[in-house]
Structures are given as structure tokens and as C-alpha cells.
């Protein structure tokens, strides 16, 4: 999931 991955990178 790209969206979930972005939230984790934040």
C-alpha cells in the first residue's frame, strides 16, 4: 500500500 508506506515514512 503506497498510502500506508507514505504515512510510515513521515
Curated annotation (Swiss-Prot):
Native species: Bombyx mori (Silk moth)
Tree of life domain: Eukaryota
Full protein name: Unknown protein 4 from 2D-page
Highest classification ranks of the organism: Eukaryota, Metazoa, Ecdysozoa, Arthropoda, Hexapoda
Amino acid at each position: 500500500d503506497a498510502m500506508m508506506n507514505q504515512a510510515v515514512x513521515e
